[in-house]
């Protein structure tokens, strides 16, 4: 015992039901001074015998041995810092409801809201041991913070994950620290084939508003199978589109930062999953479409099919990815766009090897990312599943890379591949939900061929929430 005290804070994620705990760890939580954040299962292991139970209740004011998993009540929102955060209807997992026995010792940080099938407030079941339509979702007492579920699944931009992210960030001492309200915008998928008339209005508007911005530039435009070029393969560079290149350099002089967005944003002649064309396909991860959400036989991609992340591409290796990224970086420099410092992975998907390869060329990425089973014990699980995550603030990840957040999503007028449409007003609402995160950013992206009016709605609304647009650094 005593090991926990060597650290600023300790986090325990209870994913395996009834997993045994080392006695030394139990004693550290019950009697130590370290801050502890516990989420999910096995909190009852701290009160397994009478002595431990009495010690826990006396110190923390609630009883884990009589706190039960509520899987009967429908919880579709979580209240935190005066906002209702969403909880996906697909998430049918139960939530452990802390049984509070001494209210004076327990601070309720967030409440689970019980709803009926129509979405209206409903009295919670008796298993929650509460009165009314709420029970504690997160509690804090004497250095121990407990969250009744692992809020890392079924997440989206307005999810209760934001409360989790803020609580995690709060483990670090920040007494008296004012909330940080930074915003960022990225113009997406600008390739040598982009139309100047699509891009210029966005750039002119952002400059006029004195809004710093990023441009995600794809160094090489490739139509490997001639899908849009009469069956003839086509590769194009920025110096073959001189008016566009001139506009990009103008943007750089007026608050624009170039971000390398892959090298070709596609992979050879492979339909990955669509057509082998830049900006459409994945570059560093294999994908295909299926008719069902949970996989099945690959089918031709259509508007209503599901995109599946299938594993590493055939060329996958650390060196392959490093060389490919470096090729694109050199190309941007060759055409006069300077030495880029930020990288964005196409479609936010890469293998473990590819992420490590990217690190050889860039120390900072600006995106969301994937994680894989076995990472903590250094066992590369290859294509045995993946886990996507976004952040509401800047982090340094397990790959050793600094990651700048994109956490609001993008404007999208229509549903595509079962992703819902998202308006400029939706982006503003997402930014509003992110206000619960003390150090939260409001970062989104926007494609050049979409209406300027929607960009204006997003920028204006995010400013009115109190955010300040800054360069992504």
Pin down the residues of each PLM region.
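Aromatic-Pro/Gly-enriched surface loop or interdomain linker
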Residues: 1-8, 179, 206, 215
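A glycine-rich, often tryptophan-bearing local segment used as a flexible ligand/cofactor-contacting loop or short
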Residues: 12, 16-89
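Acidic (Asp/Glu)-rich catalytic clusters
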Residues: 32, 175, 202-210, 237-263, ...
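Metal-dependent polysaccharide deacetylase catalytic core of the NodB/CE4 family, i.e.
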Residues: 44-46, 50-52, 212, 216-353, ...
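Catalytic beta-strand/loop cores that center a nucleophilic Ser/Cys/Thr
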Residues: 70-141
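Non-catalytic propeptide/linker segments at domain boundaries
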Residues: 116, 122-182
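C-terminal domain-boundary segment and adjacent tail
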Residues: 163-179, 197, 201, 208-219, ...
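Catalytic grooves of carbohydrate-active enzymes
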Residues: 183-191, 196, 319-322, 326-342, ...
């Amino acid at each position: 015992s005593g090991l926990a005290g060597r650290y600023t804070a300790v986090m325990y994620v209870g994913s395996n039901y009834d997993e045994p705990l080392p006695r030394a760890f139990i004693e550290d939580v019950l009697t130590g001074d370290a801050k502890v954040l516990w989420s999910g299962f096995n909190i009852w292991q701290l009160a397994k015998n009478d002595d431990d139970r009495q010690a826990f209740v006396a110190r923390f004011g609630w009883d884990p041995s009589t706190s039960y998993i509520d899987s009967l009540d429908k919880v579709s929102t979580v209240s935190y810092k005066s906002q209702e955060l969403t909880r996906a209807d697909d998430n049918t997992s139960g939530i452990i409801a802390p049984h509070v026995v001494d209210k004076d010792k327990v601070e309720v940080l967030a409440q689970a809201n019980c709803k009926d099938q129509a979405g209206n407030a409903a009295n919670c079941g008796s298993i929650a041991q509460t009165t009314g339509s709420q029970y504690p979702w997160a509690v804090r007492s004497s250095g121990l913070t407990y969250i009744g579920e692992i809020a890392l699944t079924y997440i989206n931009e307005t999810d209760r994950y934001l409360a989790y992210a803020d609580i995690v960030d709060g483990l670090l001492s920040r007494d008296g620290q004012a909330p940080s309200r930074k915003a960022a915008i990225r113009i997406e998928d600008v390739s040598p084939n982009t139309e100047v008339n699509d891009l210029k209005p966005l750039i002119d508007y952002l400059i006029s508003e004195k809004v710093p911005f990023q441009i995600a530039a794809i160094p090489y435009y490739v139509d490997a199978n001639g899908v849009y070029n009469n069956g003839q393969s086509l590769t194009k560079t920025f110096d073959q589109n001189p008016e566009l290149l001139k506009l990009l350099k103008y943007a750089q002089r007026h608050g624009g930062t170039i971000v390398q967005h892959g090298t070709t944003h596609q992979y050879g002649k492979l339909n990955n999953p669509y057509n082998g064309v830049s900006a459409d396909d994945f570059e560093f991860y294999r994908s295909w479409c299926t008719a069902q959400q949970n996989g099945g036989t690959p089918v031709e991609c259509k508007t209503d099919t599901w995109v599946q992340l299938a594993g590493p591409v055939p060329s996958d290796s650390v060196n392959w990815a490093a060389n490919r990224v470096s090729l694109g970086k050199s190309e941007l420099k060759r055409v006069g766009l300077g030495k880029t410092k930020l990288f964005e992975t196409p479609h936010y998907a890469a293998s473990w090897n590819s992420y490590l390869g990217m690190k050889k060329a860039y120390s900072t990425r600006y995106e969301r990312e994937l994680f894989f089973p076995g990472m903590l014990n250094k066992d590369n699980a290859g294509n045995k599943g993946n886990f996507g995550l976004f952040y509401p603030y800047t982090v340094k990840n397990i790959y050793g890379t600094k990651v700048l957040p994109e956490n609001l999503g993008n404007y999208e007028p229509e549903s595509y591949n079962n992703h819902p449409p998202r308006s400029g007003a939706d982006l503003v609402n997402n930014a509003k939900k992110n206000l619960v995160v003390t150090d939260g950013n409001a970062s989104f992206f926007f494609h050049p061929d979409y209406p300027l009016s929607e960009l204006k709605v997003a920028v204006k609304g995010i400013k009115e929430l109190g955010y300040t647009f800054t360069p992504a650094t």
